[in-house]
């Protein structure tokens, strides 16, 4: 017999305005509010600091938005960017850079403790001095959102608000190289037409050896639009590339290959390839990886998540051989091309799924490993390492991470208090934070591990 059910009405959460004192910051630089009301909810609110008394509005079970600072912290400063209160890009400008660095190191330490990488009651971590960046104008690549306002016949270009699809229109960005937004502003009159703007998803501006603007196109552009873009490109000497769902093409065969210098070598790339946003700090990070790994001409190196050869090329110049392993086939090919362009014949490039890599994918055991994964981390590589026979394991590893939670998870596999010491006996010998993303909560970390004797 058929049965009919009437869906129950959902209880709508009622937004409330409350007052509380901030107890701490979490690893995303959100203020932690504890013990609110009879249910003792914990809430997370962006923009406040430990010790501050704030007024905020509840927006969900564990979230809220900051309305007023009633009792400010002595660590608070006025944000230097005029768009800070609206833009969702930077989220940590309300404290000095020294505070940002201290907080980030504390986050790494707390996550290592949580995941069992070390026990703060019985040992300390071998922290080295952080690699410090210029606090502003450090980005050589920015991605901007776009939206065509049909009624106003106007194109919005800017960054999205925090946790929102709304766009904050900007004419400058304090953390970006000045040339990037200047190029976008000059191109704006050409983009601000319905024939282009209605087919524009987002745009990216990059500047290494020369500027380039990448337009993400959702549909084919008409002939007159392509002609207008081509004329602008020729007049301003700024290359334009068009990216559709399955294709990346230069407009009118624009320009020579783009390159960035690292350790005296040139790395060629295409717009759309992964490129560290902070060129200055990247050079220092690569040099520190070389110093920590200390490769010799008799040693083999594995470079996992190799990209276009950021670490592989400098390491190949100092070692017997390098196997560069990269998940994206196009970039794996580019790494090999970059090695050849720099006169290196001791680098092999392999495109492989790094989440499911096995010993059969690797040929000769390597003495040194370098890892630079994206935010999901390198769990597959760490699991492989744990399974290898002792004679197949590297003597030294440098792990570069942009996500401290997955870093802690991965290190716990091979170096944690609960790891199988018979199969994976590594200890942390050096670590530091890398100031890749000043004015934001994002944390870059470098860790050096060595096999215990």
Regions inferred by a protein language model and the residue ranges of each:
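Terminal RNA-binding accessory module
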Residues: 1-83, 349
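Rossmann-like S-adenosyl-L-methionine
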Residues: 2-19, 24-28, 220-453
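Short, solvent-exposed loop/turn segments that connect beta-strands within catalytic domains
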Residues: 38-39, 149-155, 393, 420-424
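Residue-level recognition of conserved beta-strand edge/terminus positions
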Residues: 57-59, 145, 450
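Extended interfacial segments that mediate partner engagement and assembly in macromolecular machines
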Residues: 67-78, 86-200
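Structural signature of eukaryotic scaffold interfaces centered on beta-propeller domains
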Residues: 206-207
